Amino acid sequence: MPEAGFQATNAFTECKFTCTSGKCLYLGSLVCNQQNDCGDNSDEENCLLVTEHPPPGIFNSELEFAQILIIVVVVTVMVVVVVCLLNHYKVSTRSFINRPNQSQRQEDGLQPEGSLWPSDSSVQRPGASEIMCAPRGRDRFTTPSFIQRDPFSRFQPTYPYVQHEIDLPPTISLSDGEEPPPYQGPCTLQLRDPEQQMELNRESVRAPPNRTVFDSDLIDISMYNGGPCPPSSHSGISAATCSSNGRMEGPPPTYSEVMGHYPGTSFFHHQHSNTHRGSRPQFQPNNSEGTIVPIKGKDRKPGDLV
């Protein structure tokens, strides 16, 4: 044991390098370490380039700087990614919440500027041709079909739908006196005054006459019976609307009754010449039977009753 302790002491006391100034360096690591350990720089003069090593403190500082730079870059990238994701989800949520309100505003905006439902304030000017559109109560509050299919869809322009509705030609129906009343749709083309239109509609639903008396026969009846009767404006009128006193006292005669009194002759025989007026069939009221019986003009005398 004393020998081992002596050898260790001798190793520490042995001079590894002797400086020019006579100073002794006991550690070999102090030689050529780029530090002036001798004081006269004699320990760094004869060092080879291969054996020269930078001090370990330089490597440690560079390593720490690289680690710090890498950590800063990674943290910055992570923060940027998190901010982008939060912004994206915030915009998506806001747009999803605002879509129902936007659809409601667009539906409300169709009333004044979409022309899908006209307003109720349609002014009627007599004598002028105009189109009156009166929306029904059910259609005024009905959402269009293209909005009902996808309420959360983006708003599409209504120009194609409006143009399709405007380009449709108007339908003008002329009354012939026997047709049903016109269809009262949402849009009606009015070419007459309201009073004339109501009169035509009232006449169009009138019951058909029992039999037809043409205008020429009606004029002849009024001339010979002394009762004024205006000419008909239609193709025919009821026989009970005109008589000698302007009122019929009984139902009109049937075809068999008329042909039974005058077999071989036609009940409706038209002659428009004044030379054959005497041979034209005439009508006289029969108070006993309540019917009109025609007689020949040449056999008629004033005051004769059948």
UniProtKB/Swiss-Prot annotation:
Localization: Early endosome membrane
Compositional bias segments (type: Polar residues): 281-290
Keyword Cytoplasm listed: no
Membrane-crossing residue ranges in chain numbering: 65-85
Motif PPxY motif 1, chain ranges: 180-183
Stretches in topological domain Lumenal: 1-64
A single GO molecular function term of this UniProt record: R-SMAD binding
Record motif PPxY motif 2, residues: 252-255
Keyword vocabulary terms for this entry: Disulfide bond, Endosome, Membrane, Signal transduction inhibitor, Transmembrane, Transmembrane helix
Residue ranges, annotated region (Disordered): 100-127, 268-306
Segments of skewed composition (Basic and acidic residues): 296-306
A Pfam family: Ldl_recept_a
InterPro entries noted in UniProt: LDL_receptor-like_sf, LDLR_class-A_CS, LDrepeatLR_classA_rpt, TMEPAI/LRAD4
UniProt short sequence motif SMAD interaction motif (SIM), positions renumbered to this chain: 208-211
Residue ranges occupied by any LDL-receptor class A domain in the UniProt entry: 11-48
Cystine pairings recorded for this chain: 19-38, 32-47
Domains as described in the record: The SMAD interaction motif is required for interaction with SMAD2 and SMAD3 and the negative regulation of TGF-beta signaling.
Protein role: Functions as a negative regulator of TGF-beta signaling and thereby probably plays a role in cell proliferation, differentiation, apoptosis, motility, extracellular matrix production and immunosuppression. In the canonical TGF-beta pathway, ZFYVE9/SARA recruits the intracellular signal transducer and transcriptional modulators SMAD2 and SMAD3 to the TGF-beta receptor. Phosphorylated by the receptor, SMAD2 and SMAD3 then form a heteromeric complex with SMAD4 that translocates to the nucleus to regulate transcription.
Family: Belongs to the PMEPA1 family.
Name assigned to this protein: Low-density lipoprotein receptor class A domain-containing protein 4
